[in-house]
Structures are given as C-alpha cells and as structure tokens.
Amino acid sequence: MDAQRFVLPMNGENISVVIGEDITGHISEEVGHYDSLVFMISRNVEEMFGSKIPPLENYGSSTIKITLNDGESLKTLRNYQRIIKVLVEKKVSRNSLLVYVGGGTVGDLAGFVAATYKRGLRMIAVPTTLLAQVDSSIGGKNGLDFSDVKNVIGTFYNPYLIIDDLQFLKSTPDLIREGMGEVIKYSIIAGGDMFRKVSECSLSNFHDHSADIVKMSIKIKADIVNRDYYDRNGVRSILNLGHTIAHGIEGASKGQISHGRAVATGLMVEAHIGEKYGNTRPEVIDEIMKLADNYGIERVRISDIGVNSILRYISNDKKMSEGYINMPVPADIGNIITMKVTERMISDGLNTFIREHERK
C-alpha cells in the first residue's frame, strides 16, 4: 500500500499527515533538525510492535525515552511533573522534538508536555489506535484530569506531523470496534460519500478500506474544528453527537463500557429522542443500528446500568444549564440539528431504547 500524504490546515497552521503501513520510519527523517528527541511511547505498543518501530539508536545519542502506561490514570499532574523533571534534568532545549507513539491518553499527556515545556516543543504524533487516529490526534485539544474531573487542565496545541500507521490497527478487532463508534458518528454528520463508504464496508473487510476511512474521518473533523477551533461559538459541539448519552453510560458503568459501544448506543438513543419529538426521520435509527451491527459493535444494555444512574451522570454534564442541555441530534443522515433536551426527554429516550431493543 502506497502511503497517502496530504496537508491539513488547522487554525492557521499546516499539519502534514501521512497514512499507510510500516511508515514509522518517517520519524527518522525529522530528527536531524533538532538538538534532541523526547520519545514518549505506550508500554503496550512497545511490547506488541517494538520490532516495527525504528531503534532509538537511529535517532542519535541525544534521545530521552519515556515509557508510559496507557489509561486515564496516566493523565495526572504528578505524571506531568515527573516528565518535566526529566526534561529539565536532561537540559532539553526548546529546539527539541517530542514524538509520541500511543493511544489517546498518551497523546493527551504528550500534547500537554509539548505545549507547556519552555512554551512549546515541536511535536510529531504517531497515534496507534483507530480512535486516536480519527479523533483525539485531530483538533489540538489535550488535557489532564484533576480532582476526578476529566480534562479540566489543558491546552490547544497541534503536532506539525501526524503519522497514521495502519499496521497498529491489525492487532485485534477490538481496536476497530472501539474507533468505529466515532467513524459512524462522522458518517452521520457528513452523509454523502462518507456514509456510503462506511455503509459499504464492514469489520471483515475494514483493512481493505482503512486508509480511506481514516483520511475521510480526519478531514470531516478538521473541517468542523476549523470553524470553531477554540470551542466557543457552538459549531464544534456537533462533534458531541452521540456523546451526551455515551458519557452518561461510561460514567454510570464506571468505565466498564468501551467508548465505541457507548458512542454507538448514544447515537441510537439520541436518534430516538429526535424521532419522538418530530425532528428525526424514523428510518435513521435503523440505519445507525445497521452500521453498528456491520462492525460488530454490541449495543449497551441500558437496563443493566440503570436509567437513573445514567441520568445522574448526565445531570452533572458541564453543558447542562437551567435544566436542559443543547444536544445535537440527526434530523437525517448528513443533517444535524441542535435540540434543547431536558432530563425527562433523555429518560424517555433511554426507556424507549430499552423497550425497542432490549425486550424483543
């Protein structure tokens, strides 16, 4: 497979993106321009794909390697301070390059380090999950958790190069399912060619189309982000499609439900809410369900988690104001609107989902 290369405009910057297989060697082409290399890598990725990543000796003697454990618990001030301490002790200059290889949580921490150490290091992102390739590595957001609040500390900071190596996606089908919730979301937002591409594919032939799916997803998200980079005018909120319910599911399940399953189920529930109040074409619900089924994404059993438990987490959502939340819902494929939704309306949607999809 020949690598695809394109330039992604982002908030006045031009980000280079390379998509292909066995392309991590592109890192070596960049290192010579800098005083030193800070190489942050996921421990899981290193154990599974270490032979696919060029040896650090290739990058010269002034390399600082930092191995990280994946997971939300990584994103703490303590871990951030430990890394900064290493960089200070190693006298890492501002003319240094930070490269991260890993999933979304590694990218969050690495992005925050790059943005803040000496007011900014140049950064290369090598996201290793489908979710990170199509979502968290795009848009500039990074963040740390504090006092049990996710991403309460963070910046907007872009890599200048993103290397999407598709070899990382071949380790397990779970990586595909986890990311396809977001890809399905993009297909509903954009409609057209994206919806057709995702509809024509399935879990069994995903790798034949992965480069196109990743590229199309990136461009859809980037187009939305560029109209509201700092998340202030409401345009970027369209990317929350499916996520009001998904965040409630993830919180109420104590993280036991994967993000992909939560988002796919959230898309269905939110479409039910839109349909009940006359805003969503009824067939949209079945179309979302068919996509999820094609990629083997199991629907969440809402009744096992509890409607009230989910509502408790949603009621604490920072977007909830004066008893309602502005929630994006699909009026149709390719047509997203915003509804003012109360907790009662969300409760009705969750209970409708239980009746329609859990008791048949």
Curated annotation (Swiss-Prot):
GO biological process, one term: chorismate biosynthetic process
Ligand binding (NAD(+)): 70-75, 104-108, 128-129, 141, 150
Pathway the protein contributes to: Metabolic intermediate biosynthesis; chorismate biosynthesis; chorismate from D-erythrose 4-phosphate and phosphoenolpyruvate: step 2/7
Cofactor requirements of the protein: NAD(+); Co(2+); Zn(2+)
One term under GO cellular component: cytoplasm
EC annotation from Swiss-Prot or TrEMBL: 4.2.3.4
Localization per Swiss-Prot or TrEMBL: Cytoplasm
Keywords: Amino-acid biosynthesis, Aromatic amino acid biosynthesis, Cobalt, Cytoplasm, Lyase, Metal-binding, NAD, Nucleotide-binding, Zinc
Protein origin, superkingdom: Archaea
GO terms, molecular function: 3-dehydroquinate synthase activity; metal ion binding; nucleotide binding
Reaction it catalyzes: 7-phospho-2-dehydro-3-deoxy-D-arabino-heptonate = 3-dehydroquinate + phosphate
Cofactor: binding comment: Binds 1 divalent metal cation per subunit. Can use either Co(2+) or Zn(2+).
Enzyme class: lyase
Positions bound to Zn(2+): 182, 243, 259
Coiled-coil blocks: none
Keyword Chloroplast set for record: no
PANTHER family referenced in this protein's UniProt entry, alphabetically: 3-DEHYDROQUINATE SYNTHASE
Record-stated family: Belongs to the sugar phosphate cyclases superfamily. Dehydroquinate synthase family.
Role this protein plays: Catalyzes the conversion of 3-deoxy-D-arabino-heptulosonate 7-phosphate (DAHP) to dehydroquinate (DHQ).
UniProt protein name: 3-dehydroquinate synthase
Organism name: Thermoplasma acidophilum (strain ATCC 25905 / DSM 1728 / JCM 9062 / NBRC 15155 / AMRC-C165)
Lineage: Archaea, Methanobacteriati, Thermoplasmatota, Thermoplasmata, Thermoplasmatales
